[in-house]
Amino acid sequence: MDKNTLTGLILMGLLIFGFMWMNSSKQKENQQQQQQEQAEAKKAAADEPQITVDSISAAEAAAIPAAIREGGVRQGDGDSYVYNTPSVRLAMVNGEVTGSVQTADTTLDYNDVIANRLSRDITLSTRNEAVKNIREVLSDTRRYGQFASHRTGKAGTVKLGNDKLSLEISNQGGYISRATLLDYKSYLPADAKSEKIDTADVEICRPGCNKYSFELTSATQRINTADFFFTPRQVSDSVVEMTLDMAGGGQFGFRYTLPKGSYVVRMEMIQKGMDKVIPISVANAKLIWSQKMGRNERGRTFEERNSGLYYKYVGDSPDDLGAQGEQTDELTQRLKWIGYKNQFFSMVMIPRTCFTSAEVASTDLKKDPDFVKALASEAFMDYSASEANPITIDIFMGPNLYPLLSSLDKEIPGADKDSLDLTNLIPLGWPIFRWINTLIIIPVFTFLSTFIKSYGLIIFLLTLFIKLILFPFTYKSYKSQAKMRLLAPEIKAINDKYPGQENAMTRSQKTMAL
């Protein structure tokens, strides 16, 4: 065997050995990876919750008819009720319940769910969802009583408006979700870095940024109108009702009335037969009102400084919570009204029978480019379940115009003769300047604006008018100043002729003689 042959055999052996070694290492790595994947799969299977079949117990099934009587709507005079929500549609006649249960992907027969005789094609998650929806009938009825069937629904709005104001009333809570002033435009940059200005109708409140509700609390229940879906009814062009129909024939809701040409919408709580639903021990209702106040002007600083939460004690002057920073306060006396004031526009709640007390809060939103403040109030009012209209609130939503705010005392009747003093929402300066503004400046400005559309021209004419009024008082001053200008060269000559401190007396005598 020569040297070359030996070298070739050795190289071939090394190559075979290396291939076998590499193949063995790869098999070992694959085996380890498979073991790791199997371990992870076992762990994931152990961590994954096991879906078990749920079902309605006999006790729960027996309680359903009573729950439908409590939370459903009675049909006729017999033992006939319906209980309809987006998840269940049930009907009961003489204790026999029929209907359907809606899940995410199908509709099931109520009695099939109760008896657990669903098709094998129905998945476990669908079965459990149907059981959950039926159980909600029991839990909602225990918590909300006759209000239970109104817990769920499809959100929507109904419109109400006149030539000044356009309103959208949400059926979810029965409150005014949007209020638009038709005669006024906002003046905002298109974006933070743009010089372009976008104009749009001013919105006093907008969806997601303004909400109010009423809360009734007894020893066993806490009912908040924000939890329910109301049924809207357009009574007329100026009246809308949002109602909840009860099982025993009772009714609860709100009536909104917006007269033509007015910035004031009247909100009345309407009810019938509620003394059988709300315990007689419930003697007050809590108004919960929150608002993120949006910007309307390009200049944020001045708008923020002139926006805030205002209120008026009965028999006292209006006050505010403080224009800057985070402020809270407990108002323990009777209140005539509570208002959220923007620089040029306001929304004010004015109850007919006053608020008995309130807790108020204000927070600056300096980091939010679209809003200036977050305002909140919780105000208590007298309530009686036996009255047809236990609560009436007039809601002003409009511009801070002195003549308009002053006229609201005549437009809004009250339980007492105490003035609203809503004109105090307008900053008119110290008392003496306030008198001048209210007695002279504002009447003249209002008169000129009736036939002159340019505010610049009005301000120019108003300046001339003020100059004419002040002329008799300033004439002598102007005359004295003119004489001094004429005598100035001669006085200078006297000063030059008699210089020095030793000639001071002589200079004074010569000047007086002149």
Residue ranges of model-derived segments:
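Positively charged n-region of N-terminal signal peptides that target proteins for export
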Residues: 1-4
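Hydrophobic membrane-insertion alpha-helices, especially the h-region
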Residues: 8-20
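Alpha-helical transmembrane signal-anchor/signal-peptide segments
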Residues: 27-42, 480-491
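Soluble non-transmembrane domains of integral membrane proteins
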Residues: 56-421
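Interfacial loop/helix-cap signal at membrane boundaries in integral membrane proteins
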Residues: 367, 398-455
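Membrane-interface amphipathic helices and adjacent TM-edge segments
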Residues: 469-514
